[in-house]
Design a protein with these regions (language model features):
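A conserved helix-loop-strand patch within extracytoplasmic ligand-binding domains
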Residues: 31-80
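Short, glycine-/small- and polar/acidic-enriched structural segments
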Residues: 2-47
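Short helices/loops that flank or line small-molecule/ion binding pockets
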Residues: 1-7, 72-73, 93-123, 127-128
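A C-terminal functional module that forms or caps the active site or interfaces directly
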Residues: 126-163
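Periplasmic-binding protein-like
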Residues: 66-75, 175-198
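A bilobed periplasmic-binding-protein/Venus flytrap-type ligand-binding module shared by bacterial periplasmic
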Residues: 38-49, 151-169
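Ligand-binding "clamshell"
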Residues: 19-31, 44-46, 118, 123, ...
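Short amphipathic alpha-helical coupling segments at ligand-binding clamshell hinges
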Residues: 54-56, 165-176
Length: 210
């Protein structure tokens, strides 16, 4: 997108895009939000969190944004407590205490589904959960990432937003995406993993009136 090979992208959440902009200086702008997701805790060895025992291993993604989200979900599940100032991207260093004497193992997100038999439980990214057929009903804990930093979004090059013709096209794309048809796909195809988020906010408004 930043190199001009494509006009829009629609895959990252706010935290990821903000991190990329900070790291690489991309001149990109958020033009719409897409959905919130559920990032869940799965296990092939236990049926409830209460069955966790000393020394059990919980795998989480090893990248900063998804790993941080996983830790917040483990806190919501009552497994551990994070430091009060850990915000939206905590690391394992931000773990203040454990309510269960478990070990956290950081793995590449794409390897976690296949590693599930080798650990006690694991937080699985939504895309891999869908690809591997993990159902929401089978989760030990359903993690709700319905907070704006975790919403996925559509982004454009900032320079293109000064072109009224491109803004008009982008507006049509956003309206087509934020539709009842998309909601139906979320419900019928993705098993409840995706939910519309932020559709009531028109992020293109400042550019349509420029």
């Amino acid at each position: 997108l930043a190199n001009g090979d494509i006009d829009l992208d629609a895959f990252q959440h706010h935290l990821y895009l903000d991190s990329e902009i900070e790291s690489y200086g991309y001149d990109l702008t958020k033009i719409a939000t897409e959905y919130s997701t559920h990032m869940n805790l799965f296990s092939e060895k236990i049926d409830s969190i209460d069955q966790l025992k000393d020394g059990d291993v919980i795998a989480i993604p090893n990248d900063p944004t998804n790993g941080g989200a996983a830790l917040k979900i483990l806190q919501d599940a009552g497994i551990l407590t994070l430091k009060a100032d850990s915000a939206f991207s905590p690391t394992v260093d931000d773990i203040e205490s454990y309510n269960y004497n478990v070990k956290i193992e950081e793995l590449a997100a794409n390897t976690i589904p296949s590693a599930l038999p080798d650990v006690t439980a694991a937080i699985v990214n939504v895309n891999y959960a869908i690809d591997y057929g993990f159902k929401m009903d089978d989760a030990l804990y359903v993690g709700d990432l319905n907070e704006e930093p975790y919403w996925t979004l559509i982004a454009a090059r900032t320079e293109d937003l000064s072109d009224p013709d491109k803004v008009a096209v982008y507006d049509k794309i956003v309206k087509a995406f934020q539709s009842e048809g998309t909601k139906k796909v979320y419900e019928e195809t993705f098993g409840g993993y995706y939910e519309p988020a932020g559709w009531d906010e028109d992020l293109l408004a400042p550019y349509k009136n420029a």
